[in-house]
């Protein structure tokens, strides 16, 4: 049975942790979905881990729709959330609703995610009014990397911490069904999680969030450009891939692959007629 926004709320109410990962293509989505994950975020992080950009700012709506369609086709259990890219909702409320609608209508996503606190409250209200579930995102919001001066922990001083608590309450009031808390102190995320009734999903926000999310390339050691402090490696798939490719190259060079069992047969009398 497909997880829904109601599932997320039920899990929080029961005190059971919510599990999420990113996915960007059909085959990986199918693997992750079959593992029993609650939700999959098609993150604009694909700009960095799939497309090689320095940050997420260059990702377009077309990029996001293309990848979201693939992920939806690979799932039958997880709630699929489409990440609204930079400048797809900041320009106007109309654009926010229109582009959110494209994720649902064209890509088949079940919800969308927006970055920001009070500044995007009106956009969230309008999207929810259009019957589209919205996941909020506060703390380190990668689309604001130029304002932050880099990828840095947020909420370490009283002023910013209080602002994050207030933002979380505003997002709940605006109609968000959950909120991602990224790169904020663990004890602050505890206060936020206890201050609102909707689920919090942490990434670099400690154990007190109602759920956790990671970029799958990070948690499987497949992305070597950098490794955030908050990432734990749950499998060295990157090394396994390199080892497998190296072995493939070796066997092709030494004519050990393909073997007879990998080849298709043809009758000798047919072959003899070809000379």
Swiss-Prot record:
Residue sites binding 3-methyl-2-oxobutanoate per the record: 44-45, 83, 113
Entry keyword set: Cytoplasm, Magnesium, Metal-binding, Pantothenate biosynthesis, Transferase
Quaternary structure, from the entry: Homodecamer; pentamer of dimers.
HAMAP family xrefs: PanB (MF_00156)
Cofactor: Mg(2+)
Catalytic-site annotation from UniProt: 182 (proton acceptor)
Pfam families assigned to the protein according to its UniProt record, in alphabetical order: Pantoate_transf (PF02548)
Organism: Clostridium botulinum (strain ATCC 19397 / Type A)
Protein name: 3-methyl-2-oxobutanoate hydroxymethyltransferase
Binding-site list for Mg(2+): 44, 83, 115
Enzyme Commission number(s) from the entry: 2.1.2.11
Cofactor descriptive note: Binds 1 Mg(2+) ion per subunit.
Pathway: Cofactor biosynthesis; (R)-pantothenate biosynthesis; (R)-pantoate from 3-methyl-2-oxobutanoate: step 1/2
GO terms for cellular component: cytoplasm
Catalyzed reactions per annotation: 3-methyl-2-oxobutanoate + (6R)-5,10-methylene-5,6,7,8-tetrahydrofolate + H2O = 2-dehydropantoate + (6S)-5,6,7,8-tetrahydrofolate
GO biological process: pantothenate biosynthetic process
Subcellular locations according to the entry: Cytoplasm
Family: Belongs to the PanB family.
Function recorded in the entry: Catalyzes the reversible reaction in which hydroxymethyl group from 5,10-methylenetetrahydrofolate is transferred onto alpha-ketoisovalerate to form ketopantoate.
């Amino acid at each position: 049975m497909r997880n829904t926004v109601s599932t997320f709320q039920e899990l929080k109410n029961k005190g059971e942790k919510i599990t999420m990962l990113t996915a960007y293509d059909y085959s990986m989505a199918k693997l992750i979905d079959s593992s029993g994950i609650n939700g999959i975020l098609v993150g604009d992080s694909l700009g960095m881990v799939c497309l090689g950009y320095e940050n997420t700012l260059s990702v377009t709506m077309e990029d996001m729709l293309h990848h979201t369609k693939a992920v939806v086709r690979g799932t039958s259990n997880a709630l699929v959330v489409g990440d609204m890219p930079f400048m797809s909702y900041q320009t106007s409320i109309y654009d926010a609703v229109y582009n959110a609608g494209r994720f649902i209508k064209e890509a088949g996503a079940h919800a969308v995610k927006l970055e920001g606190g009070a500044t995007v409250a009106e956009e969230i209200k309008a999207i929810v009014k259009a019957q589209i579930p919205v996941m909020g995102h506060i703390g380190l919001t990668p689309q604001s990397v130029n304002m932050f001066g880099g990828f840095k922990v947020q909420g370490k001083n009283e002023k910013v911490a209080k602002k994050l608590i207030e933002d979380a309450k505003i997002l709940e009031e605006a109609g968000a069904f959950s909120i991602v808390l990224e790169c904020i102190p663990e004890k602050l995320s505890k206060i936020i999680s206890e201050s609102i009734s909707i689920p919090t999903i942490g990434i670099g926000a400690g154990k007190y969030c109602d759920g956790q999310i990671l970029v799958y390339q990070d948690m499987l050691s497949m992305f070597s450009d950098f490794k955030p402090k908050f990432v734990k490696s749950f499998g060295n798939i990157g090394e396994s891939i390199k080892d497998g490719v190296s072995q493939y190259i070796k066997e092709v060079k030494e004519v050990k692959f393909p073997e007879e069992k990998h080849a298709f047969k043809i009758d000798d009398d047919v072959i003899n007629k070809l000379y």
